[in-house]
Amino acid sequence: QKKELIKILDTLKDTGINTVMFQVRPYGDAMYKSSINPWSKELTGTQGKDPGYDPLAFIIQEAHTRGMKVHAWLNPYRVVSSGTDVNVLSSNHLARQNPSLLIENRGGLYYNPDLQEVKDHISNTVGEIVSNYDIDGITFDDYFYPTDYPLPQGEDKDGVVANARREHINQMILQVKNTIKSIKPWVRFGVSPRGV
């Protein structure tokens, strides 16, 4: 993995790229050493298994050596994109420990954006990254309710539910922004919006 990352960074540097977006939270897990989230299954094939090195620390060191910035890229809500059995998750995964924090949609599991405990978990995750790593930025992707997540009564004539959902997302984004700025005010924070 390290050799592959170095090759990618060298190619990016040679093409004039100055900032790398590195996915650090694909499924409520971590591509970095975390006391909050388990190791990502993307590293070893088994969620919770230590890969023997810290990919985020490695990429930051290698990118900074090349004069490149690194933004940690997170999917805040996605837990499982295919399947709904929390028992397949690592025993220290918050979703397995507390399935009441989840919503099911399209055969996958997501943290429920309505819940303050979810907002706190996401904010704590970002705070851990910003505190422990010389990161240049944090970027969110898929920071919304699943597109076709059903409305409580099937429709929302007055937009009350849609407005409440937007407000929950706004609250989470503001909480994360405040967390970042309270730790390292210079770290950038961005969101990759999805066109609807």
Which role does the model predict for each range below?
Residues 3-30, 132-137:
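Catalytic domains of carbohydrate-active enzymes, especially glycoside hydrolases
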Residues 15-51:
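Aromatic-lined carbohydrate-binding/catalytic grooves of carbohydrate-active enzymes
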Residues 32-44, 78-106, 143-160:
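Aromatic- and acidic-residue-enriched segments that line the glycan-binding/catalytic groove
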Residues 1, 61, 71-72, 77-132:
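Active-site-adjacent "subsite" loops/lids of carbohydrate-active enzymes
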Residues 1, 37-52, 105-120, 158-168:
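The substrate-binding groove and active-site-proximal loops of carbohydrate-active enzymes
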Residues 60, 64, 69-81, 139-142, ...:
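Aromatic-lined carbohydrate-recognition surfaces of secreted/lumenal glycan-active proteins
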Residues 121-138, 146-147, 154-163, 173, ...:
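Active-site and adjacent substrate-binding regions of carbohydrate-active enzymes
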Residues 2-15, 42-66, 167-175:
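Aromatic- and glycine-enriched glycan-recognition loops and surfaces
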